[in-house]
């Protein structure tokens, strides 16, 4: 179905810079996210008929309710999307609208960048559709403002069509998903639902209830700096220790060599001097045993290097971030079966594959609310080549409406 306000709403949202900050210690991590919630989303939620709209400054979540208009629809369903965007320029987002895309290259504004089907064959799935792209200088922010726009549009449709019967609906827009802490302070008591969905997936049909299990690894290397002219048998180069550590990890177990259910070690940062260096990694895997084995491996590498050095110069700090929500959702597949049924009725083929990443739903599921993930439409997310199809967004709205009417 076409929805008159969906495109304009999405464009309005993406023009607001809500980039999160991994180095911040506040919640939300950036003031712009709170401003977006309070000055744009909250008034709009109230205007379209959501009730009890309130912002929690402790956890950064904006929540609203649409009560059921049919008492026989007894389920309570939640929909969640995140306000922040990824670690890429989000200032002065200037979306391009490509009507009736007919294939071929899309020049991104006046930049030297283009969307080329040879580099991005997923473009070929969108012939004849309306695409929203960047101008080549920023990301787009479809991750996850497409999800916000879809939820808002579905609520607006339901409140404007009171004859359409639906169950109790909760809506939550949260911060800092992109930096992995968005759901850390989520309050289940403020979101009383039987299950929920994050609208944070990619192409049409995605329905996901398996995520990575994730850990952050920080390794500090302590060197000993002396003049290089007299360094023999004295200098210990911390940067070289970092290189040695990295080379002991399996070379083929990096993101660029893995897919499907394969896990990886990913070096995300390396800084330092001869005296001291620091390497940042993320560790990802799907199965609990292999996830734990990866953590044991890095500990063993550090121990081996320290034994060889004769002193403790490789210091490992490991912190689990989130776990594969499959463990929770498999206990009750109601949310998945309902979504599959609705999609199939809408002639959308459910694409059930693992998320090679995480969502806020990962943590929220372990808090007691099963929260799988549904497509929101974004492609090539987190950079200047990001785009989204208006038609896919419309279909996501259809799914939301179908879910609450069938509950």
Swiss-Prot record:
Cofactor needs: Zn(2+)
Entry annotation: catalytic residues: 84, 177
Cofactor comment: Binds 2 Zn(2+) ions per subunit.
Pfam families linked to this entry: M20_dimer, Peptidase_M20
UniProt cross-references to Gene3D superfamilies, sorted A to Z: 3.30.70.360, Zn peptidases (3.40.630.10)
Compartments where found: Cytoplasm
Subcellular location, principal: cytoplasm
Keyword terms: Aminopeptidase, Cytoplasm, Hydrolase, Metal-binding, Metalloprotease, Protease, Zinc
Catalyzed reaction equations: Release of the N-terminal residue from a tripeptide
Recorded family membership: Belongs to the peptidase M20B family.
Role according to the record: Cleaves the N-terminal amino acid of tripeptides.
Name by which UniProt lists this protein: Peptidase T
């Amino acid at each position: 179905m076409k929805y008159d306000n969906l495109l304009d709403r999405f464009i309005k949202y993406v023009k607001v810079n809500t980039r999160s900050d991994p180095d911040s210690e506040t919640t939300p991590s950036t003031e712009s996210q709170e401003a977006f919630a309070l000055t744009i989303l909250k008034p709009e939620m109230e205007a379209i008929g959501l009730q009890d709209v309130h912002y929690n400054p402790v956890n950064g979540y904006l929540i609203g309710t649409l009560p059921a208009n049919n008492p026989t629809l007894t389920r309570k369903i939640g929909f969640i999307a995140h306000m922040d965007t990824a670690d890429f320029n989000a200032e002065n987002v200037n979306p391009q609208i490509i009507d009736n895309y007919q294939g071929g290259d899309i020049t991104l504004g006046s930049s030297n960048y283009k969307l080329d089907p040879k580099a991005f064959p997923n473009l070929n799935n969108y012939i004849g559709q309306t695409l929203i792209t960047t101008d080549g200088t920023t990301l787009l922010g479809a991750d996850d403002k497409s999800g916000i726009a879809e939820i808002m549009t579905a609520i607006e449709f339901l409140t404007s069509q009171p004859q359409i019967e639906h169950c109790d609906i909760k809506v939550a827009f949260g911060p800092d998903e992109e930096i992995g802490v968005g759901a850390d302070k989520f309050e289940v008591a403020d979101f009383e639902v039987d299950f929920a969905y994050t609208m944070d997936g990619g192409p049409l049909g995605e329905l996901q209830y398996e995520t990575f299990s994730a850990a952050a690894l920080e390794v500090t290397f302590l060197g000993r700096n002396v003049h290089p002219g007299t360094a023999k048998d004295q200098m210990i180069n911390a940067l070289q220790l970092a290189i040695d550590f990295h080379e002991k990890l399996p070379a083929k177990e990096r993101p660029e060599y893995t897919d499907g259910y394969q896990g990886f070690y990913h070096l995300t940062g390396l800084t330092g001097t001869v005296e001291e260096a620091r390497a940042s990694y993320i560790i990802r895997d799907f199965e609990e045993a292999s996830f734990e084995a990866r953590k044991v491996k890095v500990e063993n590498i550090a121990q081996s290097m320290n034994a060889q050095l004769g002193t403790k110069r490789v210091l490992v700090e490991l912190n689990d971030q989130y776990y594969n929500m499959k463990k929770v959702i498999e206990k009750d597949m109601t949310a998945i079966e309902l979504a599959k049924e609705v999609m199939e009725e809408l002639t959308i083929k459910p694409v059930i594959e693992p998320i090679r990443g995480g969502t806020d739903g990962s943590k929220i599921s372990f808090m007691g609310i099963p929260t799988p993930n549904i497509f929101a439409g974004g492609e090539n997310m987190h950079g200047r080549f990001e785009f989204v199809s208006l038609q896919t967004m419309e279909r996501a709205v259809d799914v939301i409406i179908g879910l609450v009417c069938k509950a």
